[in-house]
């Protein structure tokens, strides 16, 4: 991850999106162009969102995230591999697109695995964001509600990718 890449809070709008990513990856693997993928998703309402605008926005977000993988075999794996495997690749795509998630996974989760520390709690998220706010003016300028939402999203991503059993878990799972 390029450290000149800015921190962005778009995660509040474009969270994990596993099922959307899987649908988009299937179309991409079938050889559809990016524009044709968006058109197909909108026309078939594959994401089951209420408005065409939201479907289009999320389809483009998924395409951007899949392109961040820079590997057609990983895109194909999201489309065709078992859910647990596909979710790990989707997490990797999210990490490649979001410096915030990249650094959280490396500095918090990665460090815990390295130290064989299975504990995890709100304090880990709080410490990560406090440290980040001290180090980065952009993150420091985010509202408390944005920070809270990002913490919730990261925790949900950890549950969805089975790093945590549930949102109240105080121990990491073995992945």
PLM-predicted stretches and their roles:
Residues 59, 63, 151-156:
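Short, hydrophobic-biased segments on the C-terminal half of alpha helices
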Residues 122-130:
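An amphipathic alpha-helix signature
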Residues 88-92, 96-118:
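Positively charged, polyanion-binding regions of nucleic-acid-associated proteins
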Residues 159-169:
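A short, conserved structural fragment
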